[in-house]
Amino acid sequence: MSFSRLFRLLKPTLLCGTLAVPGLAGTMCASRDDWRCARSMHEFSAKDIDGHMVNLDKYRGYVCIVTNVASQUGKTEVNYTQLVDLHARYAECGLRILAFPCNQFGRQEPGSDAEIKEFAAGYNVKFDMFSKICVNGDDAHPLWKWMKVQPKGRGMLGNAIKWNFTKFLIDKNGCVVKRYGPMEEPQVIEKDLPCYL
């Protein structure tokens, strides 16, 4: 193997300051500033709706739908209803849903985490709710920065999240396999699930 080919293969990990050793990459590369070095969703952590830090490695071996949510959007009812339905029918098959409240689009998620949790309970939400975050800009959560630049996570007109209820399908290895725009209802994802569950 030529030196130039070897360098091209190792360049991403050398820029992080470490070779990608399983386990080590997650602790070294998935910090707030080093999200570009992550190889899977499992290298990130996020606060749940109750304020507890969750290591997303707990989703290893599960297929996940990751979505930004809002309680005052015109798409709220259909998305919450269909996400609850998907979770009820596929959780036993290995589907997990991670919902991240976000107030960046029309200020349609203005409440506190406690208020958002109470709102979601009205839909009988059993899937995992996380603390309110930003999904765009410098303050975007590192997971969302990472998902948007993955080969299958890129958007149609730029990578920025366009609105509430943008959804990412994540495989069992923590890799983005598809991005769904805010106009695509959760039931659209169902046809893709058998390939990954």
Swiss-Prot record:
The EC number(s) attached to this protein equal 1.11.1.12, 1.11.1.9
Molecular function terms in GO for this entry? Answer: glutathione peroxidase activity; phospholipid-hydroperoxide glutathione peroxidase activity
- Sorted UniProt keywords: Cytoplasm, Developmental protein, Lipid metabolism, Mitochondrion, Oxidoreductase, Peroxidase, Phosphoprotein, Selenocysteine, Transit peptide
| Domain of life according to the entry | Eukaryota
Oxidoreductase: is it a keyword of this entry? Answer: yes
Write the gene name. Answer: GPX4
| GO cellular component labels | cytosol; mitochondrion; nucleus
**Annotated function:** Essential antioxidant peroxidase that directly reduces phospholipid hydroperoxide even if they are incorporated in membranes and lipoproteins. Can also reduce fatty acid hydroperoxide, cholesterol hydroperoxide and thymine hydroperoxide. Plays a key role in protecting cells from oxidative damage by preventing membrane lipid peroxidation. Required to prevent cells from ferroptosis, a non-apoptotic cell death resulting from an iron-dependent accumulation of lipid reactive oxygen species.
Gene3D superfamilies documented for this protein: Glutaredoxin
Which family does the record claim for this protein? Answer: Belongs to the glutathione peroxidase family.
Protein name in UniProt? Phospholipid hydroperoxide glutathione peroxidase
A matching Pfam family: GSHPx
Q: Where is the active site?
A: U73
Native source species: Sus scrofa
Any GO BP annotation:
negative regulation of ferroptosis
Listed under catalytic activity are: a hydroperoxy polyunsaturated fatty acid + 2 glutathione = a hydroxy polyunsaturated fatty acid + glutathione disulfide + H2O; 2 glutathione + H2O2 = glutathione disulfide + 2 H2O; tert-butyl hydroperoxide + 2 glutathione = tert-butanol + glutathione disulfide + H2O; cumene hydroperoxide + 2 glutathione = 2-phenylpropan-2-ol + glutathione disulfide + H2O
InterPro entries assigned:
Glutathione_peroxidase, GPX_AS, GPX_CS, Thioredoxin-like_sf
- Does the keyword section mention Transit peptide? yes
